[in-house]
């Protein structure tokens, strides 16, 4: 992790320090950090632990396009959207099947897998950025 912070994450830390409003998280896997091959965009270790907690980012986190093979090869649109939100992502970009992703999130909230408070956290971050524009 120290090597990652000292090298690959330097531009992200600088962006955070300079007040970036958005960060796009790609689908690269970092098994040395996360312990598995989960894409960074779906990993709570990468989104919440590293980006939000270690780097101190409080803005909007958006996924890279969710219709890419790194996601669609393993996850349904619904599972990918739910997993990304659970990881700490605020906005889902281009799911392969929008209706399925939307319904998956709605079902996860209705079933308690994702709390309404979690959704409200994302909404608040998005509104805060919009008001700054």
Regions picked out by a protein language model, each given a short descriptive name:
Residues 123-130:
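Short amphipathic alpha-helical coiled-coil/interface segments
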Residues 112, 132-133:
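Short glycine-centered helix-capping/turn motifs at secondary-structure transition points
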């Amino acid at each position: 992790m120290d090597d990652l912070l000292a090298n690959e994450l330097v531009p992200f830390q600088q962006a955070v320090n300079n007040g970036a409003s958005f960060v796009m998280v790609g689908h690269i896997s970092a098994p040395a950090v996360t312990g598995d091959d989960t894409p960074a965009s779906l990993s709570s270790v990468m989104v919440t632990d590293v980006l939000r907690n270690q780097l101190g980012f409080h803005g909007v986190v958006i996924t890279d396009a969710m219709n890419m093979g790194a996601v669609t090869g393993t996850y349904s649109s619904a599972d990918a959207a739910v997993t990304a939100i659970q990881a700490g992502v605020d906005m889902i970009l281009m799911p392969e099947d929008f209706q399925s992703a939307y319904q998956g999130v709605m079902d996860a909230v209705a079933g308690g897998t994702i709390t309404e408070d979690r959704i409200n956290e994302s909404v608040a971050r998005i509104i805060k950025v919009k008001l700054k524009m």
